[in-house]
Amino acid sequence: MDHLEKIFGKTAQMTVLENLIEHQDDPTYISGIARETGLSNSIVSKVIKPLVTSGIVVERPLGKTRTFRMNIENEAANLITGFCNGINQIEV
């Protein structure tokens, strides 16, 4: 998702969002996002909260842990996902 970085800059929230979009069909954990992005668990936890609060990301308990994934039932999440996928298909 280098095109998004060129346009919006690299922020922790964009990095987490990009990771969730790349793995939108699979629920993931804070630790998995942290490992794949190079961010700390605490940073991922901090920046994912507004995405969950806004309904863009769904949080589900799984035992003592929580899983996260893009909310395919949320219009904003679908628009963001479509935009991200589309922007990567053009030259920027």
Regions found by a protein language model. Give the residues of each.
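Short, Lys/Arg-rich nucleic-acid/phosphate-binding segment
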Residues: P61-T67, E73-N74
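Short helix-capping/hinge SLiMs at alpha-helix to coil transitions
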Residues: I21-D26
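Key DNA-contact positions within bacterial/archaeal DNA-binding proteins
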Residues: S42
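Amphipathic alpha-helical dimerization/coiled-coil segments
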Residues: E75-V92
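A short, conserved structural fragment
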Residues: V52-L62
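A short acidic, leucine-rich amphipathic alpha-helix
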Residues: G32-R35
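Short alpha-helical segments that sit at the start of domains
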Residues: M1-T15
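Short, hydrophobic-biased segments on the C-terminal half of alpha helices
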Residues: I48-K49
